[in-house]
């Protein structure tokens, strides 16, 4: 799908999708899972070739940030959620050529939706492709800040459940949610680092107007301020995970201790029963009238005595 936007009164205005001849007026062309026909339209009409989705997965810096005859290229990760609402990252290709921004992605992304909604009312100061690019990055950082706040709130709730130490369904659910928070934080960290590298490359390779240069530096400062917060969440996740494992180990040790003490407690009684269960021909107690009650009494005494001792020691 091709989404094309042109400038009208310093605002982004969406162009008619059916009228592809208007693409020459576009300042921003956003492609979402473009078909081969749509790629050919761009190639024939604007002489612009697009990266393949396989190239978007490359993580080497030389493959993600470079400049060639087709323009300035940036590949950047955007935070999103998959079909099962788990944290995910989508790689977006940005290309700036002849004053026009091309974006290529394989799915709809929250940051793009939010920016398109804002662009209906937001005026552009410099009215160029670099401003659209920086605004998209700025929207992405705002989204990441919201994700960090969400993780923080969830960890506050989980900490009360885990540090309470009472194992049960709520405790098990908290462990599962904790792993999801760790995954979210790791993806936010990767996204922040990737955006930082992309903006640093952009500042080095282009001569941005003063306003946009300051905007880029402001975004970089926002990233630097968010990174310590995200790292502190990582540390809190690790602390809660270690605390949860500690409580689980304590509970397992308590169970093993109980069974160990119980087995030792009944060992003397088992010894008495084994003694009188032997099949020797001459056993005086077998002819004793009260031999059976005596054996039962010995077994009870052999069991009760260790129990009372262990109880006094606090082992039970």
Curated annotation (Swiss-Prot):
Q: Where is this site: Essential for ion permeation?
A: 253
Magnesium keyword on record: yes
Keywords linked to the UniProt accession: Cell inner membrane, Cell membrane, Ion transport, Magnesium, Membrane, Transmembrane, Transmembrane helix, Transport
> Which superkingdom heads the taxonomic lineage of this protein's source?
Bacteria
Membrane-topology descriptor? Multi-pass membrane protein
The record's annotation in InterPro entries points to:
CorA_cytoplasmic_dom, CorA_MIT, CorA_TM1_TM2, Mg/Co-transport_prot_CorA, MgTranspt_CorA/ZnTranspt_ZntB
A GO term for molecular function: cobalt ion transmembrane transporter activity
* Transmembrane annotation, as ranges: 258-278, 290-310
- Decide whether keyword Glycosyltransferase is in the record: no
Q: Where is this motif: Probable selectivity filter?
A: 277-279
**Known Gene3D superfamilies for this protein?**
CorA soluble domain-like, Magnesium transport protein CorA, transmembrane region
Q: Which family does it belong to?
A: Belongs to the CorA metal ion transporter (MIT) (TC 1.A.35) family.
Q: How does it assemble?
A: Homopentamer. In the absence of Mg(2+), interactions between subunits are weakened, and dimers, trimers and tetramers can be observed in vitro.
Record's function text:
Mediates influx of magnesium ions. Alternates between open and closed states. Activated by low cytoplasmic Mg(2+) levels. Inactive when cytoplasmic Mg(2+) levels are high.
Under which name does UniProt file this protein?
Answer: Magnesium transport protein CorA
